[in-house]
């Protein structure tokens, strides 16, 4: 009832921001808040473009037990000399942004300026991939995890853990040292599979990759075991120890996250690094498609009525953002959107059928490149110009992070289905490198100018524009 009463004074939108590792969640939140507070030019965000957005400012968040999103620290990273990307999301955090605006509705204007609270909830997308575990027993999860680790795209990364499977007898007495060693091998496999060159996405349990405040906890000290055809195991065995911890993980980690945070969201943006999956080849793209389907199925989506909006909110607007659009020439942005639409197509259709609005955008919350041209032979190529991060490579060239380069990233396929069928492995000239942030521009009045972006205003309009009418 507290949320209900406060909502009568100043409405609140709970905006979920998620995505898999390195997809740009932290940068998106920092850029969104900075642009709104600084009064940036946002032509496709109606309230700002029409001069109705009067002020934006931060306020104390309502959930005092949830860590605050460190906006000031992350902004400091982006405006440092040289600028650097902020650290990735590793746990759930929250930030309250309040907007004061003039309504388009006559009766609201008679009441003076209006206020809208935006409670931004930042959480790792890896945690969403845990929700399907709620319907799996430990035995079912173990069998699934072992089968997945034997797939061609994971086999190499899983080799050390796979080797240890044959050395562990699930009927042996429970041993903490054995459990820790075996769990560490499993976690190492998941981390290897997530990193380049594999760039895989569907790697639960999510807290094994993003432990948050549970790092080192016994709740994260378990791993799949091979039952070896046995139907039951003795009490006090390694199997029953692992099974008990798996069930505790679901009860004390997964369910509270769903109940206390995820189930209360009104709007959602999902950040997806499609280009990283394309770099990883067809297996990584196929795995991203599986992850997108699982993530979208987790959302309690649909249109809201008065009752549901107050007591059982549904996510009625979803933005799927193909991030790092600045790593491509704008001529390929529509193709990037088409690939993401193809990846999430079935799940999008279900959400739209339930009444939710879903929009796909090629986006860069902070634009790290500009566009240019380069000649190769007699051909003029559309390029992007920026500072590749140290260690990034194209062919035999390794960048040091200090030099500006014009790079031709290639063209995405006109048929998005080709991206799911191994197209990238046949086009070796395609390589998407990462760039450092742009140099900040100091303002004479103090502070820094908002960073250039690609379609950030369209994302904001889709997520909250209707609430500012």
Spans of model-derived segments:
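Conserved beta-strand segments of the P-loop GTPase G domain that flank and frequently precede/overlap
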Residues: 16-18, 270-273, 321-324
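Short, conserved secondary-structure transition motifs
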Residues: 321-328, 361-373
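Short secondary-structure boundary/capping segments
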Residues: 32-37, 133-138, 285, 334-340, ...
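Catalytic or ion-translocation cores adjacent to nucleophile or general acid/base/metal-coordination motifs
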Residues: 347-353, 358, 363
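Glycine-rich phosphate-binding P-loop
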Residues: 15-33
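GTPase G-domain guanine-specificity segment
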Residues: 327-352
